[in-house]
């Protein structure tokens, strides 16, 4: 299984609609195992991540009002890709590429007034 990242908006209260995301593979957020080995790892928690660790237990829905904080967390994680890559066994390039995809989705969400779904 693969972990994907998408942007969404609410058409009406409680009715989520996924936006069209790029078709170039930039919707990839990692392998299913990266939920626990990377994004939900103790290392991610130790550096101060609060959104990403939710993936260890469930899909991550970043609500529109939390997108700015999520972008800040992406920047925090970006400063630790080498350690996260080593700790998870995925490698720095893998972590950096998946984090870049997630960050771009968050930036699209901010522009659209929407949120981010990692699932």
Predicted regions and their residues:
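Acidic (Asp/Glu-rich) sequence patches and key acidic residues
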Residues: 1-119
